[in-house]
């Protein structure tokens, strides 16, 4: 709602130390992150909130384990947790994260808006009644770390032989960033 005002509420966000540069400033030359930073500032001003980023560690698994331990031991003051999907998803089963579809969390969220990655979020749900992870324009890491390899079938065949060998390499676990 346009008149929504959180009256200076502090939003505590757990984040890996390695990613604070993306969220804490607009400098650094990355146009996407500069836009995210500016958009977050607009939201903060409109809703009258301040973000406090709580840095944990560099390691994805250490970050998730610390955050989940804090939450499950009632030591947590986090309002939002930024985790890597690979390590974070399993922790929803441990009861560490709130179901965003519960009214107390979702009453101001319109998950039908185009800035949410609805297909991505749908793929991370356990049922139609649960949602533990959000993804959208505010966190472009979801798409910035996605990768795909395209190759010209005919050129590959001419220089390296059977293109199906590439698929077999992947299927057999031999694919690396160097190979």
What is each PLM-predicted segment?
Residues 45, 87, 92-95, 101-179:
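Helix-loop-helix "hinge/cap" segment bordering the ligand-binding cleft or interdomain interface
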Residues 1-95, 157-167:
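Conserved N-terminal structural module of periplasmic/extracytoplasmic solute-binding proteins
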